[in-house]
């Protein structure tokens, strides 16, 4: 899974644009991009998306809100439906994850991607325990709130951010956890965005967030080279389906975690 596209969950036009885009994962957002007064409306829109037959071939992983909306309300409503995972914002420690996953049925928890978004000093310092204590397979980095946490401009202090990114990637990959890189809010300078994507991949990131559909082709072109040949893809698909029927939602292949989003992505490659 190479590109994760954020879209405000309270604005139908942006949701439709995301669904019709070539994002490998769509992230309807309930956090920063949605005013508090619109969050319940956004939650209703996410539930309607997950109920819709038109998104059956799409991977939908909402980012929930942990500062305004009731966590149990969001998680209980979303997990009643067919969903692929959740992104948890501003995860500072292992308890931040447990405060969310305690509302997810264990059998479902084993089949979905719970993705902590690390965007603070505490989150970086507690990264290994966050991954290990919660069996996390995919984890995300956010530079903008991290910059606020460090009292720096994350764009101006790019060398420091790159240093932290390298530590983030190393700690993640050493624990067989897939790292996703931060979004870039400058959507006008495409050449700069491409350069950032190339650097990101060279650091070891496996995917990147997008905030606009125009960023997707660049992300997909740079990150979306499959490391598996056709025979391996068929093997992975068959093994995932067999294990899934037995109630197992992930397995390890060539030092990589195969979960539902990876399975759906490889299924799309094999079918294309």
Tell where the protein language model's regions lie, with residue ranges.
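Expand to "…catalyze enediolate/carbanion chemistry for C-C bond making/breaking, isomerization
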Residues: 1-272
């Amino acid at each position: 899974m190479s590109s994760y596209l954020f879209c405000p969950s309270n604005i139908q036009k942006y949701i439709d644009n995301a669904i019709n885009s070539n994002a490998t994962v769509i992230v309807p957002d309930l956090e920063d991009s949605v005013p508090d007064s619109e969050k319940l409306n956004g939650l209703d829109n996410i539930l309607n998306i997950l109920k819709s037959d038109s998104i059956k071939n799409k991977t939908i992983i909402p980012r929930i809100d942990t500062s305004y909306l009731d966590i149990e309300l969001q998680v209980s409503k979303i997990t009643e439906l067919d969903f692929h995972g959740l992104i948890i914002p501003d995860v500072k420690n292992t308890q931040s994850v447990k405060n969310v996953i305690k509302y997810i049925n264990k059998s479902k928890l084993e089949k979905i991607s719970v993705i902590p978004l690390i965007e603070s000093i505490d989150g970086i310092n507690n990264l290994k325990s966050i991954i290990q204590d919660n069996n996390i397979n995919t984890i995300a980095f956010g530079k903008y709130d991290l910059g606020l946490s460090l009292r720096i401009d994350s764009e101006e202090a790019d060398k420091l951010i790159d240093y932290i990114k390298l530590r983030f990637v190393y700690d993640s990959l050493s624990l067989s956890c897939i790292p996703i890189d931060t979004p870039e809010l400058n959507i006008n300078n495409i050449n700069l965005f491409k350069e950032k994507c190339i650097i990101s991949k060279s650091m070891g990131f496996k995917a990147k967030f997008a905030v606009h559909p125009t960023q997707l082709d660049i992300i997909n072109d740079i990150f979306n080279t499959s490391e598996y040949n056709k025979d391996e893809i068929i093997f992975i698909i068959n093994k995932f389906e067999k294990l899934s029927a037995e109630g197992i939602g992930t397995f390890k292949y060539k030092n990589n975690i195969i979960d539902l989003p990876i399975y759906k992505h490889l299924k799309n490659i094999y079918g294309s």
